[in-house]
């Protein structure tokens, strides 16, 4: 298990015994989240496994598959834990695929208010059936609330445009600027943001930029070691 505290321009830590604050935590979510106190999380931004045996075709990605991405048996237990740790007015952003959006809406909606489906429009298309299907150019983000909290800065359109990354650090890497936007809309400085499937740690990088505290879990040690360098401003390859 790799748990490393990062030095840098982080948010001011909140008072109280909240474990894993502003640390890289190499641990499965279902073990780590048990240590997170009730009603301690201001915002959830996470990209869970889609349950579709994702396989990257990107030639520079060394870890091409995603651990535990072969089923969604864990989904409701995960949502129950999110309900426990989230504050009463917390927002949640959960990345989804069209393959599983109905299931996610059903299970997440049993515990939270599903407010909208945001569309992340990418600058170029993904892989797939090059002759018999339309080229994928978007991902879905389930926007949920644990209460009636308002968005910062008013109401924006639900189509979000952001360039996709090169996916060199993780096969489903998310742009830091996209995560930063979501964080700014739904949290304030020094709030605590939770990401239970950290991957490339885009959420942690965005939190560092926007002066939020983060709690991030990632089961793959290689991604955690890469994140240690990314959060210090030095990018390295996976090993």
Residue ranges and their predicted role:
Residues 1-6, 10-225:
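Core catalytic lobe of class I
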Residues 223-239:
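Cysteine-dependent PTP/DSP-like catalytic domain, specifically the C-terminal lobe
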């Amino acid at each position: 298990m790799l748990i490393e505290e990062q030095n840098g321009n982080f948010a001011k830590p909140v008072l109280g015994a909240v474990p894993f604050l502003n640390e890289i935590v190499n641990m499965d979510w279902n073990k780590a989240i048990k240590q997170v106190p009730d009603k301690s999380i201001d915002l959830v931004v996470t990209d869970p496994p889609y349950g579709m045996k994702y396989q990257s075709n990107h030639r520079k990605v060394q870890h091409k598959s995603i651990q535990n991405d072969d089923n969604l048996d864990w989904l409701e237990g995960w949502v129950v834990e999110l309900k426990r740790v989230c504050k009463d007015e917390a927002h949640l952003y959960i990345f989804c695929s069209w393959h599983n959006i109905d299931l996610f809406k059903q299970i997440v909606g049993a515990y939270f208010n599903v407010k909208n489906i945001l569309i992340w429009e990418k600058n170029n298309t993904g892989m797939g059936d090059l002759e018999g299907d339309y080229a994928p150019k978007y991902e879905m983000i389930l926007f949920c609330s644990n209460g009636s909290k308002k968005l910062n800065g008013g109401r924006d359109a639900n189509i979000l445009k952001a360039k996709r990354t090169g996916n060199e650090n993780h096969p489903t890497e998310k742009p830091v600027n996209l995560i930063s936007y979501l964080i700014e809309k739904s949290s304030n400085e020094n709030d605590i943001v939770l990401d239970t499937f950290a991957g490339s740690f885009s959420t942690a990088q965005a939190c560092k930029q926007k002066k939020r505290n983060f709690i991030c879990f990632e089961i793959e040690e290689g991604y955690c070691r890469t994140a240690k360098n990314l959060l210090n401003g030095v990018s390295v390859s996976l090993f």
